[in-house]
Swiss-Prot record:
Main location: cytoplasm
Similarity comment text for this entry: Belongs to the thioester dehydratase family. FabZ subfamily.
Name of encoding gene: fabZ
Keywords: Cytoplasm, Lipid A biosynthesis, Lipid biosynthesis, Lipid metabolism, Lyase
CDD domains: FabZ
Function: Involved in unsaturated fatty acids biosynthesis. Catalyzes the dehydration of short chain beta-hydroxyacyl-ACPs and long chain saturated and unsaturated beta-hydroxyacyl-ACPs.
Origin species: Zymomonas mobilis subsp. mobilis (strain ATCC 31821 / ZM4 / CP4)
Superkingdom in the source lineage: Bacteria
Protein name: 3-hydroxyacyl-[acyl-carrier-protein] dehydratase FabZ
Length: 158
């Protein structure tokens, strides 16, 4: 997304308070615990600590807890939201990042309790209020899920 040849400085780490300043999500739907690195207009690396105390593990699945794929994608989307809001200087403005499309999603390995899920998201392009991203979730160096999605930056719906 960067339109100049200037070197953009990395931001990070960012704690959960800074994440919450960029996102409207709260427990139990806040799925980004911290940001390790954010390069405005380019990429973000964030972390979701997946614990057995996650509410979704109660029913998904009893005796064999696995993080639902849709929530892995949601965690990636939230990381993208932080990237977009921080990159555009919109933190604290109340602007929201809404999903518009999810494409090319693949789930490679299950996400179980007790791991740190690494969320890597890159800007592919931005035009006006529309942003496209490429993302992947990793467990150590193994890809658990990958996807591309489109989102829109807008004011909250009333």
């Amino acid at each position: 997304m960067t339109e100049t040849t200037e070197k953009v400085e990395s931001i990070g780490p960012l704690d959960v308070k800074r994440v919450m300043a960029a996102l409207p999500h709260r427990f139990p739907m806040l799925l980004v615990d911290r940001v390790e690195t954010l390069i405005p207009g380019e990429k973000i690396v964030a972390i979701k600590a997946v614990t057995i105390n996650e509410p979704f593990f109660t029913g998904h699945f009893p005796g064999n807890p696995i993080m639902p794929g849709v929530l892995i994608v949601e965690a990636l989307a939230q990381a993208a939201g932080v990237l977009a809001i921080e990159s555009l200087g919109l933190t604290g403005t109340g602007k929201l990042v809404y999903f518009m499309a999810i494409n090319e999603t693949k789930f490679r390995i299950p996400v179980e309790p007790g791991i740190l899920l690494r969320l890597e998201v890159e800007f592919l392009q931005k035009r006006a209020k529309i942003c496209k991203f490429k993302a992947r979730a990793l467990i150590e160096d193994k890809v658990a899920a990958e996807t591309e999605f489109t989102a829109m930056i807008a004011d909250p719906a009333n």
